[in-house]
Amino acid sequence: MRNETSFERPLALGDVMHGRGVGRVIKSLHPDYQPGDIIQAKMGWREYAMVDANDPYYMIFRMHHTELPLSHGISSLAMSGFTALIGMRDIGQVKPGTRVLVSGAGGGVGSQCAFIAKALGADKVVGLAGGKYKCDQLIRHMGYDVAIDYKGTSVEAELDQHFPEGIDVYFDNVGGKLLDDVLARIRRRARIVICGRISEYLLAPAEYHAYKNIYRIGLQDAKMEAFFIYDYTENFTAYEATLAAWIRTGKLKPCEHILNGIENMPQALIHLYEGVNVGVMMVKVAE
């Protein structure tokens, strides 16, 4: 709770828990925002929030496609969707014929990845998730062609089966040994997109995986690149327009895991770390 980053403040005892939300402006003293506007911002776990539009910490973004469900302002038309779009299109450079692998495929970002990759022309998209139920959801609701259950099968054997010629693009949400296994199977000029490393977030540095196959990036003339979504804020409106158009045409189908009632916020957070959620985890706190 005490760790401070460039984009998040530490929590003090009695603070409101942090979190982005979607809300309707009730009153505004800022000329850029009017009552009735629908915005995304760091509102915290509460039903009413007061945010400072002049403070970049709150990262306010006014939604433009409010005829679509407002829940999309936490999923596909928000950070999860923007992150998947940047990773697949701008860094992964997915194009017709590309073969794509996504880890953490059932999470908030992963649930957008297959739809976006296919909208860009990907030939095959394989997702990694934990458990038969979540893997079924990848194929039924998230656009994946193949789902690999890392809890119930040999991941390395499955990767060899589904990528006999190697992997073109790997969108990594997990890190650790899985990334090492993928590096052993990348094709020439592959792109590895580093989005997260949830397998190691709760580990001490001494417990981090020691990579053995990192040399293959140079050997295969590949590219590995990490990115931070808030470095791209000037493009958010354009990202929103692209994703909204895909939603309207059915190319992108937001997958959302919604709990009701502010009292369920702690449980929603637990679901995230336990991997229970399928799609973007959110809580509806008001009509």
Mark where each language-model region is:
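Glycine-rich phosphate-binding loop and adjacent beta-alpha segment
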Residues: A122, L138-I139, K177-L252, A286-E287
